[in-house]
């Protein structure tokens, strides 16, 4: 039974997570704690070459509402409040932005997704109609979370199309392997292992198959949840 529409960001989220989540060429460390009242606090430090960054995020769930606040080292504050709804099998949503000064739409996106127990299809018309993104996820084994994914992004104004395929394979309940390859020749892979309960080590890398003479980019991430 539907309790209402989901968030626009959730359309295509399954495919996006498989193709982007935990892929990194940086050095990252994060630690999370949870209080008995339900407040989750996460501190993250990131190093990318000579650039250092950090942020603190807190999350709180009250009944059917989720609160998320994030503050970074530049004192930028991002907050989000949204209801926790059960998604229906077919979901559609629209995201718009309007500039009252220029009286123009700065953003207009439309998305549709169809979800089944073993697969998910989504289509998003974005950039005010200039881009189309279609994705398909198929879960090979729900018990092990293994899945394959394909994504096609078409930029109408530049006549460019990017195709990305990838997948996730659960070696066991503690270890995951992911890989992806796009039509531009970029290949990425990662190994993720839960050494301690809720504490995860991720080693990832990326290489441009069109320039194999260059060294691959590597990343290391450690996430601790006492």
Curated annotation (Swiss-Prot):
It comes from the Eukaryota. Keywords: Ion transport, Membrane, Mitochondrion, Mitochondrion outer membrane, Porin, Transmembrane, Transmembrane beta strand, Transport. It is found in: Mitochondrion outer membrane. One of its GO terms (molecular function) is porin activity. InterPro entries: Porin_dom_sf (IPR023614), Porin_Euk (IPR001925), Porin_Euk/Tom40 (IPR027246). GO terms for cellular component: mitochondrial outer membrane; pore complex. Pfam families: Porin_3. The keyword Membrane applies. Consists mainly of membrane-spanning sided beta-sheets. Putative channel that allows diffusion of small hydrophilic molecules through membranes. Belongs to the eukaryotic mitochondrial porin (TC 1.B.8.1) family. This is Putative mitochondrial outer membrane protein porin 5. It comes from Arabidopsis thaliana. The lineage of its organism: Eukaryota, Viridiplantae, Streptophyta, Embryophyta, Tracheophyta.
């Amino acid at each position: 039974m539907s309790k209402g529409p989901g968030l626009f960001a959730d359309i295509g989220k399954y495919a996006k997570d498989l193709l982007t989540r935990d892929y990194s060429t940086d050095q990252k460390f994060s630690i999370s704690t949870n209080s008995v009242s339900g407040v989750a606090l996460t501190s993250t430090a990131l190093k990318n070459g000579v650039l250092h960054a950090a942020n603190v995020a807190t999350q709180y769930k009250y009944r059917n509402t989720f609160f998320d606040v994030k503050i970074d080292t530049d004192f930028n504050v991002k907050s989000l409040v949204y209801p926790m709804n059960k998604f229906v099998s077919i979901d559609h949503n629209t995201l718009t932005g309007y500039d009252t000064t220029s009286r123009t739409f700065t953003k207009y996106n439309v998305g549709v997704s169809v979800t089944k127990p073993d697969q998910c299809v989504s289509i998003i018309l974005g950039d005010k109609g200039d881009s189309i993104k279609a994705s398909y996820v198929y879960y090979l084994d729900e018990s092990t979370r293994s899945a394959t994914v394909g994504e096609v992004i078409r930029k109408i104004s530049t006549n460019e199309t990017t195709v990305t395929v990838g997948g996730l394979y659960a070696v066991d309940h503690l270890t995951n392997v992911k890989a992806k390859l796009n039509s531009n020749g970029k290949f990425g892979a990662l190994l993720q292992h839960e050494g301690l309960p809720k504490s995860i080590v991720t080693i990832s890398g990326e290489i441009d198959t069109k320039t194999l003479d260059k060294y691959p980019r590597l990343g290391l991430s450690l996430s601790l949840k006492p």
